[in-house]
Amino acid sequence: MVVKAVCVINGDAKGTVFFEQESSETPVKVSGEVCGLAKGLHGFHVHEFGDNTNGCMSSGPHFNPYGKEHGAPVDENRHLGDLGNIEATGDCPTKVSITDSRITLFGADSIIGRTVVVHADADDLGKGGHELSKSTGNAGARIGCGVIGIAKV
């Protein structure tokens, strides 16, 4: 059973991101476009809560149900919500194209109802040596976010 979801990002960064998963055993395909980003890499994460009542700040930390350290999407030791970076050319829109085998749209660990956050700076993937590297990737301010909702299949 295919599950689809969508996230409308608002803030200084704006855009729409789509999620699709064919079954609980297959990767999630993430695609979309974001505008309002400076040229360079920008951290792109799923945060724990679908609460945007205080803007992006109320979305909580990265979605991390297994108590792991922050890491790269390819790392075994990573938050489930660690989707790495998107790269902006400085022109609108920035394309989002990610395939991830760790996030899911099914079951207790589903990202549906949680928040996508776009950050001002590059995610150092937990390898930057900064005091925030192992928790946030030192990705800077939260410049855009939106709640992931179920979409029509």
From Swiss-Prot:
GO terms for cellular component: cytoplasm. It comes from the Eukaryota. CDD domains: Cu-Zn_Superoxide_Dismutase. Cu cation binds at residues 45, 47, 62, 119. Disulfide bonds join 56-145. Keywords: Antioxidant, Copper, Cytoplasm, Disulfide bond, Metal-binding, Oxidoreductase, Zinc. Coiled coil: none annotated. Its cofactor is Cu cation; Zn(2+). PROSITE patterns: SOD_CU_ZN_1 (PS00087), SOD_CU_ZN_2 (PS00332). It catalyses: 2 superoxide + 2 H(+) = H2O2 + O2. GO terms for molecular function: copper ion binding; superoxide dismutase activity. It is found in: Cytoplasm. Its EC number is 1.15.1.1. Its main location: cytoplasm. Binds 1 copper ion per subunit. Pfam families: Sod_Cu (PF00080). Zn(2+) binds at residues 62, 70, 79, 82. It is an enzyme of class 1 (oxidoreductase). Belongs to the Cu-Zn superoxide dismutase family. Homodimer. Destroys radicals which are normally produced within the cells and which are toxic to biological systems. This is Superoxide dismutase [Cu-Zn]. It comes from Drosophila orena.
